[in-house]
Design a protein with these regions (language model features):
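Core AdoMet radical
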Residues: 117-127, 138-166, 179-195, 207-226, ...
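A structural signal for well-ordered alpha-helical scaffolds and beta->alpha junctions
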Residues: 52-53, 60-66, 74, 78-81, ...
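N-terminal pre-core extensions flanking Radical SAM catalytic domains
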Residues: 1-161, 177-178, 341-383
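Distinct, well-ordered alpha-helical segments
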Residues: 196-202, 225-232, 290-294
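Short amphipathic alpha-helix with an adjacent loop that forms part of the alpha/beta core around
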Residues: 170-177, 230-232
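Conserved C-terminal portion of the radical SAM core fold
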Residues: 33-34, 216, 236-241, 261-382
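Short, well-ordered amphipathic alpha-helices
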Residues: 170-171, 197-205, 263-269, 296
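Eukaryote-biased activation of long, low-complexity terminal tails and linkers
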Residues: 154-169, 182-184, 200-204, 211, ...
């Protein structure tokens, strides 16, 4: 068997280019927020698998998984993996490459014959206590009341599958398939609001399996407590992607109704622990000028880094809709900031004579509903 684990990064990339194979369908059990199954977080989900109606075995052995596995066994791309295929055609690093590197230490020859779950990637429905301005009812239950009053959200439907993690039995069934697991990935909604999440962790601790398991969370941080930190000490590694989209009143507007003093309290809880914390920031026209303050916080608390993503929806919040005056100001301000993704984003900003009038309209709608004042907080969208 080829020892992929011993390959250097460049050699691994070369191997991936020569071999159309991904280990993810053989080791990874992944769900969507709205109650569907998928091969990984980048694949197309199967509409034939409803998490409210299936158990782990019936999903793992479903033809959706088997068809993908057979495609990879035959050095072919499955239909559900078009995103990785497209990225690699442009020589952009894909999820397939990440998964193959992550699981290079396993016996792939054996897994090709007998797939075994080593990772549960669980998006635990849409239960959430915040209603961020770039979110929707699909990812937050607290958005339900507001979305009926806002024009661009009227097309969203509240689907039964969004409640799968609360009403279904799948999370209870997971403990019957967890003995080999090395990684648990929790996202939401807000995953720490789900009580069954604690049940799974305590089961692993009681069975003395936790020291072999790493945990990853996408979290808004509001629910983190000393009890969680004590619980996490029993695991091999814990990584938090802690969402923060600005500082002080900017974050409070974006991640409504969060209080920034509470965010700093959670930062102090996590400071000087062995938990890996990365700040997760979604950049848009509204918060781009505040990004340097997030990097300052990361350094102040000695966190592991800042993950920069880009707001795609609603479209009016995209960076390209800033005025040219602000774009020029950003290019100058961020010239020396040491973050390649951010540098690439700023360099790619085109001067297009845009006007953020739709963004101004959206924020005005939010202000009426939430009794806020965006003009005081984001004056640059009027410059």
């Amino acid at each position: 068997m080829l020892k992929l684990e011993s390959l250097k990064m460049d050699d691994m990339r070369s191997w991936n280019k020569k071999n159309i194979f991904c280990i993810a369908p053989f080791v990874n059990f992944s769900t969507t927020t709205d109650g569907l199954a998928r091969l990984c977080c980048q694949s197309t989900a199967s509409t034939d698998i409803n998490l409210l109606e299936h158990d782990v075995d019936s999903i793992w052995n479903h033809q959706y998984y088997e068809q993908a596995r057979n495609s990879f066994r035959n050095n072919q791309w499955p239909e559900s993996c078009s995103m990785c295929k497209n990225l690699e055609s442009k020589d952009i690093k894909s999820r397939r490459e990440l998964e193959n590197r992550r699981w290079a230490h396993l016996n792939w020859d054996e897994l090709k014959k007998n797939p075994k779950i080593y990772c549960f990637d669980l998006r635990l429905g849409n239960q959430c206590n915040l209603k961020c301005i770039m979110c929707t009812p699909r990812n937050s239950t607290t958005w339900y009341d507001d979305y009926k009053q806002i024009e661009h959200l009227k097309g969203w439907k509240v689907l039964p599958g969004l409640q799968w993690a609360l009403k279904g039995d799948l999370l209870d069934d997971i403990i019957n398939h967890i003995d080999n697991v090395e990684l648990l990935y929790f996202s939401g909604g807000e995953p720490l609001l789900n009580k069954k999440h604690n049940f799974i962790l305590n089961y692993l601790i009681d069975k003395k399996l936790s020291h072999n398991v790493s945990l990853i969370y996408d979290t808004n941080g509001t629910q983190i407590s000393k009890k969680h930190i004590e619980l996490w000490h029993a695991f091999k590694k814990v990584s938090l992607n802690f969402s923060i989209d600005g500082t002080y009143e900017i974050d409070e507007y974006i991640r409504y109704p969060i209080k920034f003093d509470d965010v700093l309290t959670k930062f102090n809880l996590l400071k000087n622990t062995d938990i890996e914390v990365k700040l997760q920031c979604a950049l848009g026209a509204h918060n781009l000028l505040d990004i340097t303050n997030i990097f300052t916080l990361q350094e102040e608390y000695n966190f592991a880094g800042v993950n920069v993503t880009v707001v795609q929806w609603p479209e009016c919040m995209q960076i390209k809709y800033l005025t040219d005056n602000i774009k020029i100001k950003c290019k100058k301000k961020f010239n020396k900031l040491n973050n390649k993704r951010l540098q690439d984003m700023i360099s790619a900003l085109e001067l297009t004579n845009n006007n953020p009038i739709k963004l101004q309209k959206y924020f005005t709608q939010l202000d009426k509903i939430r009794n806020t004042n965006h003009k005081e907080i984001f004056p640059w969208i009027y410059e």
